[in-house]
Design a protein with these regions (language model features):
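Hydrophobic residues within well-ordered alpha-helices
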Residues: 21, 60-61, 116
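Flexible hinge/capping segments at coil-to-helix
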Residues: 7-26
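Short secondary-structure boundary segments
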Residues: 9, 30, 72-73, 107
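Alpha-helix capping/helix-boundary segments
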Residues: 33-34, 55-56, 74-75
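Short helix-initiation/N-cap motifs at beta->coil->alpha
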Residues: 13-14, 30, 48-62
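Ligand-binding clefts/hinges and TM-proximal coupling segments of bilobed small-molecule sensing domains
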Residues: 33-50, 87-91, 117-152
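Periplasmic-binding protein-like
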Residues: 1-9, 80-120, 139-152
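A ligand-binding cleft/hinge motif common to bilobed small-molecule-binding domains
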Residues: 37-40, 61, 66-97, 136
Length: 152
């Protein structure tokens, strides 16, 4: 999936390249793909660990951080209820091994793993995965957008 950086719209001209993040406080969730990308692709930025995206949005809006690294799907949900923010034109480069979602299954649960793999193979073959993803994003926007808004 695409990984992006959220910034304030008022800072749009300040962040157009990786170099623009030198010395900048950029938030990302601890032990996340975004934190890994942040530290590897923006080595001169100051990585700031955030507990969750709602806190990260608040920190971005109040100036505690200047940017927030998130998955693009999350960014789109955040933007729905925070019109003062935008996606930075510069995006992370994501290696192929990080582009897929994962499912965690307890080690040794071979029967469950086989059922899950069969269901996923059928979903991909039938072209359902893309529509499921779009439906999930729409549902998440409707139920979770308010959680990351400071409009309350």
């Amino acid at each position: 999936t695409e990984q992006v950086i959220l910034i304030k719209k008022t800072d749009a001209d300040n962040y157009t390249s990786a170099e623009d993040f030198s010395g900048v406080d950029v938030g990302a969730q601890n032990a996340s793909l975004q934190m890994n990308l942040l530290t590897s692709q923006l080595p001169d930025a100051n990585p700031i660990t955030i507990g969750d995206l709602g806190v990260g949005v608040l920190e971005l809006q109040n100036g505690s951080i200047e940017a927030l690294a998130v998955a693009k799907g999350n960014a789109e949900m955040i933007l729905d209820s925070n019109p003062d923010l935008m996606i930075c034109p510069w995006e992370f480069e994501v290696a192929a091994e990080y582009e897929a979602n994962i499912i965690l299954i307890t080690k040794g649960e071979t029967a469950l793993l086989n059922v899950v793999n069969e269901a996923l193979a059928k979903a991909y073959a039938d072209g359902l995965y893309g529509t499921w993803y779009e439906d999930a994003v729409a549902l998440a926007k409707s139920e979770n957008a308010a959680e990351v808004s400071v409009e309350d």
